[in-house]
Amino acid sequence: MIDPAFLSREYNNRELFPDYARHFARWQDGSARARSTMSCALDRAYGASPGETLDVFPARKGDGSALVFIHGGYWRSLDKRDFSFLAPAWVDAGVSLVVVNYGLCPNVTLERIVQQMLAASAWLYRHAEGYG
């Protein structure tokens, strides 16, 4: 049996990187800036639950490519709004960025999160043309 303390050390980046709050603050600042200065469609519902939303940062040029970003947090923390800071680099490169939110554990199961990602993918398939 694997020691739970070992797993916690290996999978909890907040324990591995004690200055994580500084990085999170930088992400929040960059994300707020991206949402306030860039063309974007925020909080588009792909499902009925409050957490089933996504943000679209459409590219102004390019071939219609899109990157779908599913935020980290080990299924139990963080939010799509924490990762809007990624948008400027992708949009400037001609790639639309879609940042997807999902329900967090323990309020939902991992199986439900997989279902949410399938629903988000289906929504994107149906609506992608409207975002270039």
Task: Report the location of each language-model feature.
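Glycine-/small-residue-rich active-site loops that bind phosphorylated ligands and cofactors
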Residues: G62, W75, C105
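Catalytic nucleophile-loop/oxyanion-hole region of alpha/beta-hydrolase
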Residues: L78-L86, V98-G132
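Short glycine/proline-enriched loop/turn "hinge" motifs that connect secondary-structure elements
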Residues: R60, P88-D92
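Basic/polar N-terminal segments that are highly enriched at the extreme N-terminus
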Residues: M1-D3
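N-terminal cap/lid segment of alpha/beta-hydrolase-fold proteins
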Residues: F6-G62
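A fold-wide structural signal in alpha/beta-hydrolase
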Residues: A66, V91-V98, G103
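Short beta-strand element of the alpha/beta-hydrolase
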Residues: D63-G73
